[in-house]
Every structure is written in C-alpha cells, then in structure tokens.
Amino acid sequence: MKSQKTLIKMFSTAAVAAMSVSSLFAQTNLGADCGCPPVASRPTVLLTTLAGAEGQLLAKNTILTCDKTWILDDKIYVDSLKSLTIQPGTVIKGRKAATGNANALIVQRDAKIFASGTPTCPIVFTAEADNLDGTFPTASTGQWGGVVILGKSFVNLTVAKNTTSGSTTRYCAGIDGTGFIEGFSAANRRNVYGGGANVDEDDNSGILKYVSIRHAGDVLPVIPGTPADGSNELNGLSLGAVGRGTTIEHVEIISAADDNIEFFGGTVNVKYITTMFGADDMFDFDLGYKGKAQFYFGVKTATNDTTTTISSDNGIEADADDDKAAPVHALRSHPIFYNCTFVGNNRYNGNADNSGPAGLQAKELTEGEFYNNIFANFRTGVNFATARDNATNLGDGYDNWTSADNAYNTGTGVAVKGSLIIKNNTFFGNRYPITKGAMTTGKWSAIVTNPADGVKLSLGSADDMTQFTNDGNLVPTTIAGFNTVWAMNSTTNAVSTVLDVIPSSNLASTITAPADGFFTPAAYRGAFDATKPSWLSGWAYATVLKTSAGLQSNPTDINQDGMTDMKDFNQLLTRFNKANN
C-alpha cells in the first residue's frame, strides 16, 4: 500500500526534526554528513588551473575535494590512463561559454572518473549562477556543456557508411567501430569513442553514483562561426561506447538543453536514473546500444507550462543505427528496459527540434525489449516509424514489432520479426496508444488539427491493437493515486499542484525482470514500488522543489540505509540546532 510513502501528519518532535534534516540539510548544505563546509563558504577554484593548454588535467590522479567549489571554465579532459576522483558533497559549477562553444567535462577512452556520492552527500554539477537553494529556474537550460564519457565498447559506425555528409556529426573516426562524439570538433582525436577492432563490452570508465547534473547541454554549430542546425548537440550526460564495467546508478539529469541522457552505442547498464525538465528526449539511444535500464523516472515540464521553452519531445527516442542502407541485424541497438516511468506534458511544440512527443519513438529499425513500464501524458504512447530512407531496404520499427499474422504486416528487406518487444506496459493519459509514421513537425500539426487524418500519421489498426493488448499492454482511464496533471512555474519553480507518479497500489505484471546480477526482480509496472519507501531519497532534485508527492523516503531514515535506528538518532544529535544553510 501507499501508506509508507505518505508523510504521517503527526510526528514526535524528534521525528519532525529528523525530517527537516533529512530533506533539507543534504540539499542546502551539501556534504555536511561528510564533513564538508557550507557551500556558501567554499572558495572557488578554476579547473583550468589544474589543466594544461589543451584542457587536459595534468596530474595522473586528480582529486576534487568538497572544501572548494570547482568552476568548469573550459573543456576539461581526463586523458587516457588518468583518473578523476570527486569526493562526496563536492560541487562543480559550469561556466557558460561564448555562443557557439560549451564548457564540458570529458572522460576519454582508457580514462576513469570516480564520482561516488551518497544519499546525504551527493555530488552536484550545476550552472555557475545556481546557488543550490532550489530557486535557479528550471527553465534555464544549456548553461554549460555537460558530462561526456567515452569508452571502448561497441558502436556500429563504419567508414563505408558513415562518413561526413552535410551537417551530420555522427560519423566514423576513420576506423570501423569508432566515431567522433557529438558537440565537438572532429579534428580533435581526443573526442573519439568506440573500441574499433578491439571492442571491450566490459570496458570500465569508472563510477557515477548519487550524482546530479543540472542545467547543462547545448546545440552547437558543426563548423565554428556558422549557425547551429541541431545536428551537433551536447546532452546533460553523453555516453559514447561506454562499457558495462562502468557503474551508473542513482544519477539525475535536470533541465538539459538537449537530451537528458544519450547513448551512442555501448553496453553500459543504468539503474535508478531520474531526468526532469529536459528540452529534448528523456532517454535517447542509437548506434548499436545494447545495455540494460531499470528504475528510470523521467518527467517533462508541467502540464500547465505555456512558456516558449516548453519541452514536448519523447520519453525514449530509439534508433538502431545511422546506416540507412542495409544494416546488419547483429549490429543494431537492442537495449532492455524494465520498470521505468516516463511522464510527458501532453503538449505539442511545433518549434521543437525533431518534435515528436511519443512515450516510445521507435525509429530507424528500432529493436529492443520494453517490459513493465509506464508511459503517461504523451501525444502517443508508441509511434512506429514506417518509412525508410532507402526504398530498396524496406522495413522499420513497425515491421520489427508486428507479428506474422498481423494483416497490416508490411515488413520486407531487413526487418526482423520479433526483434522489438513491447509487453506488459501501461499507457495512461496519452492521446493515442499507437501511431505509425514519421513524426515530423508537419505531420504532427496535421494530426493535431485533424485527429481523423489517417494519411499524415496513421492510428494503430485493429490488428495492431489486438497484438498490443495480447502482449499485456494496458490503457486504463484511471489509476488510483496516480496524478500526472500538475502545475509549476518554470521561472520561479513554484509548484501549485504536485505530481504523483506512485500508484496507491502496485500495477501488477505477469512478467518479472530476471535475477541476472543487474536487474532486480519486480512484478509491478513503473519505476516505484508502492509498498516500499521510494528510491528517490532526500538528495533528489524533486524533493528540493517539492514537485512530487510520494517521492520522499522514510523521513526518519537520515542515513538512507532502509532502517530507522540509533545511527540515525546519533546523526540527528550531531546536527540538532544547527542551521541548514
């Protein structure tokens, strides 16, 4: 039942004090549990003072301590065979660069980042102007570049099929299985990712745990001095061919100017991820990504937000590859998702880049497996791409999904039946459960003005809906305790109606994630278990803004170890009567 996630109205004095400490202390006085001084008292240090002329950190093992605020004032590289360690409670602030440029942290191939925060001592990357009290506008995206990690796992770029063409920046780096990461000049070989002939799917780029990345991302020109065209973008977190030896858990990406998180190939697995208020997709994968994801919570701007910066893009944007000719099945993206909750705002922005507000946008021969997820408040639950760029190699995401007995089965060419699986998901508050077609701005405009238009963008057929339903997907009209219509001012961050994405009781599923060492078996739909405290503890940005009901863990569990005991009481005593800022 949901009672464990609802704050009890009456507490003892000690419990109330513990609640205040648990939720506020970790946010406005980051790192206090770890002995870090108040953020306002920390002197600032430019990261360029630790770097060489090309932005490379000079020490073999650089350590950023929490007694200073570190300013990311350029592109800073962790070179191959070097490491960067960031202590719990540390704050790194990105400085906004001149137009056409962006300051970012780049971890190269064979380098490592060790950023292991804790629930009460998270590590925060944010904008230089953010004073960390929750008042910096969530509408302020793109204030710095973001975090980029480059690995030696798999990426399906090839010299023959992925050379420089027009304005695209997703092209091979001269060796099959390598590429230049988006957002940077291709002339710089330090921006290469992928293992080439020596792919290591278990490649280890380090650790990101209890890390918050805020107000990052940018859309940059391919050629300096020319207008940006949307093909060269930095995300909040960009992962280029990162291997499954890398640990990425309890990470949140807030107010990114492009995608919150994007996977360019790779095999890295991610767990307990939060994305909020991004300007593009919540989760974007391409170029042969084959990782796993579980317990992912994503939300767009509020449903009442009418500002010009309103985001309307996808929950998941799924691509198999960027080779439109005849990609080999074994080289396509094929991730596996369990227990995610994606909440859109049910709005349409005709000016948005690649505007396509779908819970799951299945493009470019999309493959993958999607189980036990909730997609809410999108224009369409799933959109299947049906048109290929190359007419001699037909088949696309729709044809990978449709069963052989579907009367609308049109798959030919390189489609692989059953390679896209969508089972036991819940679709709530979406205008349409299934659509088919290329979701360009024009096509969306047509369907918005004429919902019966079956030419511009087709609604799912009767056979489609039969398969959709037989696969255990549900389209309920109500979910008890689940409220995705909420109100927030993205300039002042004032929340007038809270979001609640945890149902009163679990939405049952007949499918359970396998106990394979990564997945946690969970026979319910969505990112949160209604019978347990939320995994979004007091450190998360949602609790700072108080956007969401039910996302605060047990308030008396100060150290967030799942139990209220003497350890929590002792921590309370050490903090009692101390200021929270």
Identify the meaning behind each predicted range.
Residues 552-553, 566:
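Amphipathic alpha-helical repeat elements characteristic of tetratricopeptide repeat
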Residues 27-550:
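Beta-strand/loop edge motif enriched in small/polar residues
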Residues 2-14:
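Bacterial N-terminal signal peptides that target proteins for export
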Residues 9, 22-26:
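Sec/Tat signal peptide C-region and signal peptidase I cleavage site
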Residues 558-581:
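Alpha-helical segments with a strong preference for the paired helices of cellulosomal dockerin domains
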